[in-house]
Regions:
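Amphipathic, Lys/Arg-enriched alpha-helical "gate/interface" segment within cytosolic domains
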Residues: 1-115
Length: 115
């Protein structure tokens, strides 16, 4: 399950349990909608409660990241999991966005807003 919140140039996506392809498609639609309003967006991905993802999501994520390589200003990933932390650096090869990882959502939010 994914919960998405839009606020000006910030998109926040929180994943609960397993991230499915349907969830990822919802995320893609939200990003595309946000990009209609602003040329570069900030993204907060809260993966603290994510238990995993389906294989088709991994492939879709690579394609999505390549197609949106220049659309993100900053990406903050919130997770306490080492494997999720490691996977969070993979998209960095396909985007020019600044990417940071945090264990705390408040710290991630502060970084996204330049505080």
């Amino acid at each position: 399950m994914i919960v998405i919140e839009e606020d000006k140039d910030l998109l926040k996506a929180t994943v609960y349990a397993e991230l499915t392809l349907a969830d990822f498609r919802e995320f893609e639609a939200a990003v595309n909608n946000e990009l209609r309003r602003t040329p570069k967006i900030k993204l907060l991905l809260d993966l603290t409660n994510m238990s995993g993802y389906t294989v088709d999501v991994a492939w879709e994520d690579i394609k999505f990241t390549r197609n949106h390589a220049h659309d993100f200003k900053r990406i903050a990933v919130v997770t306490g999991s080492r494997w999720v932390s490691w996977l969070g650096w993979l998209p960095a090869a396909f985007t020019d966005a600044e990417i940071e990882q945090f264990e705390d959502a408040a710290a991630a939010n502060n970084w996204l807003h330049g505080r």
